Structure formats: structure tokens, C-alpha cells
């Protein structure tokens, strides 16, 4: 479709641009007139709560590892040398559900096929945690889910770190601190 009369379009844009501040002003009046707020804070004090939860998961994993439990692992993020001292938020924690039959781990530059679900910590409305991303689609099990092809280097540092330690067929629950996930940015799956 081609625009034949550009003058009409320019005039319309100018009118909308002039009306936009006028349309926003009444909206600001209505929102400012509220005497009480019934807004639900979905993630109250999210950063501090996330850090407390992370510290607990990290400590519990290290206790389990020290007790000889081989289903728990702690890995430093892929981009920090193992010899360097780092805060615990530079690590991911893994609970191994199933060890796969495959050998070898993907490199940072590799593509992988993955079934995954991304969930946040439990919140006001989501007692099991909000699922913000998934490769599962409408499937309910890994048997019926189609894996998603991903380039390891395109993922968050936490996700990329986990993948570089996995073998084909591994089934892990991976715990990632916000610093190695999306940080303070909003992600919409």
C-alpha cells in the first residue's frame, strides 16, 4: 500500500502530537485524585528478597555438597576465571534430576536443543513462581514438548553457564541469581 497524499498524513500527525499532552493531563488528574491505593505489589522489595532467597539456596547447596550429596552442584559463571574470588552471586546452583547418557558439553559458540521453563521466585499472586518463558508451548511433559534451538552465546550468563556444564539428556533444576539472569531489566518471554 502506498501513501498518495503525504500532506494529510503530516497534518494528522501534527494534530495527534498537539492532542497527546492534552489527553494525558486529565489522565494525570484522575490518577492523582485517588485517596487510597488498592494496587497489589507483585514483587515487594524484590531485590532484597531475591538476594535473601539466593543466599539460602546457595548455602543449602553447599551444605548438601559438603555432606556428599552428588545431586547438587555449584558453578561459577562462565566468564569469570575459577581462580578469582567472587561473590556468591557470580555462581549458579544446580540440582541434578537425571544424568543424561550423552557425553561432552556445549561450548559458548555452540547451538543446542533445549526444553526449559523460566520461573521467578514466588510472589504475591504466584505462589509457585511466575513462569515467564518456556520452550514447552502447550505440552505438559518433556516427552511431548519440542525442544528449542538456542545459541549458547545469546543467552543470559546464568543460562549459558548451566548449558556449558550439561551433557545430552541431563535434566537439571538451575537456580540463577538475578545478577546472572536479566538483572533489573524487564523480560517478556
Language-model regions: role of each:
Residues 2-13, 33-189:
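Cross-family detector of peptidyl-prolyl cis-trans isomerase
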Residues 17-24:
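Sec-dependent signal peptide hydrophobic core
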